[in-house]
């Protein structure tokens, strides 16, 4: 856009003056307060020249309101800040109405536990719905006299009736219920003691303990001569001659050596040779040591085995006697 020299001359000299420049530097609002420089003025149009450019109606009212607001801002630039007196007055009003009271806040924050308890207790629960606490009975401490009388009554009867319990309660100065409870506990203790006693008796009578045999005497041995001979050993040969006179008899100190050997040609020998051969006695019977055992089954087995051995020994002796007879 190009401006003619005539239009440039029509621009007000006050716009380019130093005073207006300083006013614009100090503040945008204060610099505008003196004179409003519109676009029409800058362009050089005056209000009288063109009536179409003249503001009318609503625009004119808005410009007037803006001018008034700018004047008020220039008159009191710190009007948006409150005066201390006014703030104090407002605070006093708040305190009077109770909206800005610190006492209420302190009271609410002072005991939060009470608030919680009040909230928890707010729903009213009837007494029937609340769980009842279990009544715990105190333990009774009996004196020596009371225990003595109760033990005497327990020895007479483990299950006393109501009348005897009441009489005993009056005697020992105790309630009848306590006496009844004492008898119940005493019977339970007695049953436990009986079970323990029966268990120990079974343990003592168990067959495992029967194997603990006493030690054998030193004079008892398999080759001991102090043992008496059984009557079944008394054969005609042994009764007629003593044991030491029998050839082939060995003393306790001699070593066991074979004294009789069987030969296939022994039966085919002549009678003259048979006279020179002396008959050999049977080997001495070794007596087994006797044990005192409590277990009955072992006694039965041992007696049966001994009887069988005796029968075999008798048969052997009879057969040997037949062979010793002269042919």
Swiss-Prot record:
**Which Pfam families does the UniProt entry name for this protein?**
Homeodomain (PF00046), OAR (PF03826)
Q: Origin, by domain of life? A: Eukaryota
- UniProt record, GO biological process: camera-type eye photoreceptor cell differentiation; positive regulation of transcription by RNA polymerase II; regulation of transcription by RNA polymerase II
Q: Where is the composition biased (Basic and acidic residues)?
A: 56-73, 103-124
Query: Where found?
Result: Nucleus
Where is it expressed, tissue-wise? Expressed in the outer nuclear layer, in cone photoreceptor.
Pinpoint motif Nuclear localization signal by residue range. 310-314
Map motif OAR onto the chain: 304-317
Q: Which residues bind DNA?
A: 135-194
Q: Name one GO cellular component term.
A: nucleus
PROSITE patterns named in the record: HOMEOBOX_1, HOMEOBOX_2, OAR
- Sorted UniProt keywords: Developmental protein, DNA-binding, Homeobox, Nucleus, Transcription, Transcription regulation
The record's similarity note reads: Belongs to the paired homeobox family. Bicoid subfamily.
Q: What does this protein do?
A: Plays a critical role in eye formation by regulating the initial specification of retinal cells and/or their subsequent proliferation.
Name recorded for this polypeptide: Retinal homeobox protein Rx2
* Species annotation: Danio rerio (Zebrafish)
């Amino acid at each position: 856009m190009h401006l003619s020299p005539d239009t440039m001359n029509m621009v007000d000299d006050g716009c380019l003056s130093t005073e207006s420049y300083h006013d614009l530097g100090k503040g945008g609002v204060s610099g505008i307060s003196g004179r409003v420089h519109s676009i029409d003025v800058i362009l050089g149009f005056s209000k009288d020249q063109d009536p179409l450019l003249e503001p009318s109606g609503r625009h004119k009212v808005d410009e007037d309101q803006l001018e008034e607001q700018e004047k008020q801002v220039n008159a009191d630039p710190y009007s948006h800040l409150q005066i201390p007196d006014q703030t104090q007055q407002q605070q006093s009003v708040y305190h009077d109405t109770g909206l800005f009271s610190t006492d209420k806040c302190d009271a609410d924050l002072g005991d939060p536990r009470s608030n919680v308890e009040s909230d928890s207790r707010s729903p009213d629960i009837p007494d029937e719905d609340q769980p009842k606490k279990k009544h715990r009975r105190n333990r009774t401490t009996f004196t020596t006299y009371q225990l003595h009388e109760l033990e005497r009554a327990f020895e007479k009867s483990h299950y006393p009736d109501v009348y005897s319990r009441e009489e005993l309660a009056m005697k020992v100065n105790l309630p009848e219920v306590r006496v009844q409870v004492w008898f119940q506990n005493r019977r339970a203790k007695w049953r436990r003691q009986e079970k323990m006693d029966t268990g120990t008796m079974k343990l003592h009578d168990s067959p495992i303990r029967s194997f603990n045999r006493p030690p054998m005497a030193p004079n008892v041995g398999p080759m001991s001569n102090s043992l008496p001979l059984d009557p079944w050993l008394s054969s005609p040969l042994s009764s007629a001659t003593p044991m030491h006179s029998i050839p082939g008899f060995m003393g306790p100190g001699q070593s066991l050596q074979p004294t009789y050997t069987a030969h296939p040609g022994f039966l085919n020998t002549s009678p003259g040779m048979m006279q020179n051969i002396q008959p050999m006695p049977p080997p001495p019977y070794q007596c087994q040591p006797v044990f005192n055992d409590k277990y009955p089954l072992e006694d039965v087995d041992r007696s049966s085995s001994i009887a069988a051995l005796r029968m075999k020994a008798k048969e052997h002796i009879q057969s040997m006697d037949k062979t010793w007879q002269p042919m």
